[in-house]
Amino acid sequence: MTVALLKTAAEPATTAATSDSTAANESSPTGDVTSVPAIADAGISADVINGGRRLFGKQLALAASALAVAGWLPQRQAWAAGSDKPEKTRVQVGFIPLTDCASVIVASQMGFDKKYGIEIVPNKEASWAAVRDKLVNGELDAAHVLYGLVYGVHLGIGGSKKDMAVLMNLNHNGQAITLSNQLNEQGVRDGESLAKHIQKNPREYTFAQTFPTGTHAMWLYYYLASIGVHPFQDVKTIVVPPPQMVANMRVGNMDGFCVGEPWNARAIFDKIGFTLATSQDIWTDHPEKVLGCTAAFVQQHPNTARALTAALLEASRFIDDPRNRATVAKLIAGKAYVNAPAEVIESRFLGQYDNGIGRRWQDPNYMKFYNDGQVTFPYLSDGMWFLTQHRRWGLLSSEPDYLSVASQINQIAIYKQAAAAAKVPVPSDVLRSSKLIDGKIWDGKEPARYAASFSLNSAQGVAA
């Protein structure tokens, strides 16, 4: 099984999107595709842009002023001295320019970090591979990161093994699969018509995701399989960093991609693609990004880990208040963060969906950050689900000890301490049950059996 890595290099502006449609300082696509091992390094060579504290000053000042008047800004420091004092007070937190990085930015810029005696320094990264590498080598203390990436590193899938930790879940929902307008012009409107088109018009169809073990890869594979398309036999899969998806579709490097917002909405805004399916269509209230770090960071800085989690819990609660959504969209839209028009971020951030080919709807299952603590709790069943899909698609050559691995990674004890400090309710069970797009029920109770239940798979020894 192979995927392809889309290489990038500096190129004339005529072959790539303009600076206002992709993240600042990103390389332009070349279209040069190379086959690589399935879990090869999924990154690109690029300088990391440090989001730091640079922001579009007037907007932030006005937003902060309004929030202070409304009584939203933190008024006191919760942990500043004694045995609870954070061991490390300046915390480097990585993020990728996606809408769901919002809790990191809000915690930093709205002062929720100060309440818990720390300073969050957001670091904007160029690719998920860069996030992985900097977490592992200690350049980043923690990061907004793909759930499945953390589990892959912990198990050494495709690279060096490093014990990892998930402090909390950051969001549910809010990703999507986008197809090119060329497919729409050829009659593709939905999953059924896509499957028929691929069968009747044989050629090399190329779909992009953002990291081989990550969430976008798993949503893409799961959706394609649900319509009878094998993601490794019937189509070609490549890896592209999120901010470069739109530029690469524009120059014809792919037929479709799976990524987080706002890049699906941006493809529609730029009139180059349409939304085939949202990730909440695949799994309503699915886990997505997490606050991830190494196990060593938690062991060496338990108070800092707890303070960081508490700060992001408060930020998550703030974001989920409908009164704050438009303000947050403007806050994260700047070049230091997502680097996209605020209106492109805001529409789907508010659940206002337009698929680009005539359908508009208000989605009740839009991107959520809190939902009374249901979003943020690190359910063991959520982590185990990604392991079942890694097994299904041959990324794991043998069955892991699902529950043991999830229990090692997901830091439920620290989460509960942070939740108590932030006055966030905690679910009573570490497992939850969900029904996915193909009708299968996932409850975390028989993971090996679940992993083996899929007729479309790439794993040796796995058969439905």
Per-segment meaning from a language model:
Residues 1-55, 76-79:
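N-terminal secretory signal peptides
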Residues 53-70:
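N-terminal export leaders
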Residues 80-239, 251-268, 272-285, 435-455:
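Short, glycine-/small- and polar/acidic-enriched structural segments
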Residues 140-142, 240-275, 294, 326, ...:
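Ligand-binding pocket segment of bilobal, Venus flytrap-like solute-binding proteins
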Residues 177-178, 290-293, 297-298:
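Short glycine- and hydrophobic/aromatic-rich loop-to-beta-strand nucleating segment
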Residues 300-411:
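Secondary-structure end/capping motifs
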Residues 384-464:
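Conserved C-terminal helix/tail region of periplasmic/extracytoplasmic solute-binding proteins
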